[in-house]
Amino acid sequence: MSAASEKPVVTRFAPSPTGYLHIGGARTALFNWLFARGRKGTFLLRIEDTDRERSTPEATDAILRGLTWLGLDWDGEVVSQFARKDRHAEVAREMLARGAAYKCFSTQDEIEAFREAARAEGRSTLFRSPWREADPSTHPDAPYVIRMKAPRTGETVIADRVQGTVRFQNETLDDMVVLRSDGTPTYMLAVVVDDHDMGVTHVIRGDDHLNNAARQTMVYEAMGWEVPIWAHIPLIHGPDGKKLSKRHGALGVEEYQAMGYPAAGMRNYLTRLGWAHGDDEFFTSEQAMAWFDLEGIGRSPARLDFKKLENVCGQHIAVMDDAAAMHEIQAYLAAARKPALTDLQAGRLSAALYALKDRAKTFPELLEKARFALESRPIAADDAAAKALDAVSRGILRELTPILQTASWSKQELEAALTAFAGEKGMGFGKLAGPLRAALAGRTVTPSVFDMMLVIGRDETIARLEDAAAA
């Protein structure tokens, strides 16, 4: 067991603020969050904003919003990588002092000429700096970069908790630049310095970074620092097995909020996307924290499956606390740039949730089924509802209205009164329910007639029946 595995767990999510929070990045953040939270560890957030041309405050805000919506809370302040550039440069100079790095005065033109000659001669284009072993007394007064003095023989071995043992032949790795000629650090150095200084014990990230692990291990070893535990997770592919792209649908996390998926459902689905705990498909965040481990992560890319996502989200909506559901619905409306609920609508919707939550897989679907509670009179009938409100049906509704004016307003009493009325008319209750649904909701497929009547109340029920009867 490595020393890192014996320490309190510290994980991190380190996105670049060049766009929205990608769903793949969100899953990486989630895996780090679950691993830390399940072990009473620390989950840190670092914004890797060293690329000043592409990094934007708007992208940083979008990342923070996406993580917040998913419920992935981080510990401490958000760390800016750019703000730590002086520390990175300090480490580069320390590597120089240790003999683990050297000043390279080769110009870009010289490097390109070296590569062109290598290509022409069929040799490796891996740049071998002539300054690696040069005596400092021969150094010119000219701009230089600092390169790491990578070993040229042997191999660098990565013991990865997902990918297994991965070996890199050192002769295939060049002396990477750690500090540019303008004094700014490279990404490869900054990542290692930040992870070390932040006390990161486990680096859980996409397997597109696996090759970086070899170079970064060399930096750790050059500085005499403990190497963290690596876990490189496979990427997410589209349903067709190809790399996820816009043609597969939404890529940004905020798009999923705007489409009305519940955060708990997204967490559940993303956790299951590439990780397994037996045959369990539905689980709470508490269960996921307790169960999540690196050994359960598969090596093959996971495929995005929107049908599974909807099914899982539907299960979460069904068991959601009413207050939490109302909060998320309001947030969904804001994210989708739709009008907020009025106090009357919110009150009715809250009262109707018990009859709706197990009938919807997304919030738009739930709100569609809640139209009866949200719309104002007169209720517009769709084609099927208009057909159900023929002359005979309108007459029946007129006769029913006085009975409802005196009925006790409870589900049991309403059921008894309407069943008795249908019996007197020589019809089954189903024949009566059709016109009632059409009058109350303007639809023929609705929640229970009794649930709708209880939610909107006696006065609104009678008013809607009178509107329909008079049409």
From Swiss-Prot:
Annotated compartments: Cytoplasm
The EC number(s) given in the record are 6.1.1.17
Keywords attached to this Swiss-Prot or TrEMBL record, sorted alphabetically, are: Aminoacyl-tRNA synthetase, ATP-binding, Cytoplasm, Ligase, Nucleotide-binding, Protein biosynthesis
Q: PROSITE patterns from the entry?
A: AA_TRNA_LIGASE_I
Query: What general EC class does the enzyme of this chain belong to?
Result: ligase
The residue numbers the entry assigns to motif 'KMSKS' region are 243-247
Annotated GO CC locations: cytosol
Give the family per the record. Answer: Belongs to the class-I aminoacyl-tRNA synthetase family. Glutamate--tRNA ligase type 1 subfamily.
The free-text function statement in the UniProt record for this protein reads: Catalyzes the attachment of glutamate to tRNA(Glu) in a two-step reaction: glutamate is first activated by ATP to form Glu-AMP and then transferred to the acceptor end of tRNA(Glu).
The record, for HAMAP family, names: Glu_tRNA_synth_type1
Q: Which named protein is this?
A: Glutamate--tRNA ligase 2
- Source organism per entry reads Cereibacter sphaeroides (strain ATCC 17025 / ATH 2.4.3) (Rhodobacter sphaeroides)
